[in-house]
């Protein structure tokens, strides 16, 4: 049958709010509509465009139920790993907007495992979001700079500066250098805000290594006076 509302993530976020200090802000994270589409199996809709739209509507419904949150990260590794075809590229911005429009929070579309191809990047730029996220650990980060130079970017950016798949903990100085490198490469672009994070989801990191990386990112953010 059709995709239907679950509320599971909203429930997890409600529980998370109980752990926050009074002045702490909640950040929510979801798969982006294209990556969820790419990883899901369609046994009902029978049409890629309809299935893609249904997934975006489903995610939008989930977001609408979220408790108050300051930032929503939509994770879109599949935009790099399995880039959309031309038809889905043209539907990409609308799908992202379907999700992002259901929150008043700042929405970040974070991509990783490398750089986006030019057409996908250009279409993603049409989405009404606060920031796009870039993998600065990947070897093809020069291609990311090329996209930004050619098509521009948002007024804020999310930078994946720590390796989310390697237990080696980078120093705050190394992470700060990666931020400085990025800013130096595009001097004409001034950002209202930078979000700093691991480049990928740190699923496979031991908890202690994950915490050490977060501490290093926070220290780098303190140097940059940006948001981690």
What are the residue ranges of the model-derived segments?
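Domain-level signal for soluble alpha/beta catalytic cores
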Residues: 1-228
């Amino acid at each position: 049958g059709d995709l239907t509302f679950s509320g599971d993530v909203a429930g997890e976020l409600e529980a998370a709010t109980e752990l926050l200090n009074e002045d702490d802000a909640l950040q929510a994270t979801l798969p982006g509509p294209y990556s969820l589409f790419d990883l899901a199996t369609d046994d009902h809709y029978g049409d890629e465009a309809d299935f893609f739209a249904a997934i975006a509507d489903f995610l939008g419904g989930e977001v609408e139920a979220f408790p108050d949150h300051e930032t929503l990260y939509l994770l879109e590794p599949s935009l790099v790993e399995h880039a959309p075809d031309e038809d889905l590229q043209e539907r990409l911005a609308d799908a992202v907007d379907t999700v992002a429009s259901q929150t008043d929070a700042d929405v970040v579309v974070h991509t990783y495992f490398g750089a986006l191809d030019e057409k996908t990047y250009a279409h993603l730029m049409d989405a009404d979001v606060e920031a796009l996220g870039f993998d600065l650990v990947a070897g093809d980060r020069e291609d990311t700079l090329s996209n930004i130079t050619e098509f521009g970017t948002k007024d804020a950016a999310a930078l994946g500066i720590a390796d989310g798949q390697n237990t080696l903990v980078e120093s705050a100085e190394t992470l700060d250098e990666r931020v400085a490198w990025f800013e130096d490469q595009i001097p004409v672009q001034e950002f209202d805000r930078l979000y700093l994070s691991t480049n990928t989801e740190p699923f496979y990191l031991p908890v202690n290594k994950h915490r050490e990386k977060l501490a290093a990112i926070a220290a780098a953010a303190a140097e940059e006076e940006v948001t981690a």
